[in-house]
């Protein structure tokens, strides 16, 4: 429910074509009726790359190319807050381009992994602790059994 509130507060939601192919998300806002009445519009749906024709999501915008150009285009459409829900490749692209104002991460008391498990960012890791990106935690909240961390640069 918390993530759907974040969606509702956003002007647009972005995922990559890989997420569309693997998860087939609808990218809709699903809130209880009383909360839904306060937020009567759905965010624009943005897909980096091309969504398959049979995908559940019906993107308002499909984009391939420079992320800065995409943000300019979305700004011209009135998008002031973009929620990036992409997988590791999209997350890395936005992070490396310095286009993230705030990270919202959920930590659950559950573990999974393995040699082929996807990490938060695609690509090679940092060679040493000196190469780590360090953000600043601006909020921590308990959401059911999980924790939500808000981190800024």
Named regions from a protein language model:
Residues 1-153:
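Enzymes that bind and transform nitrogen-containing heteroaromatic metabolites
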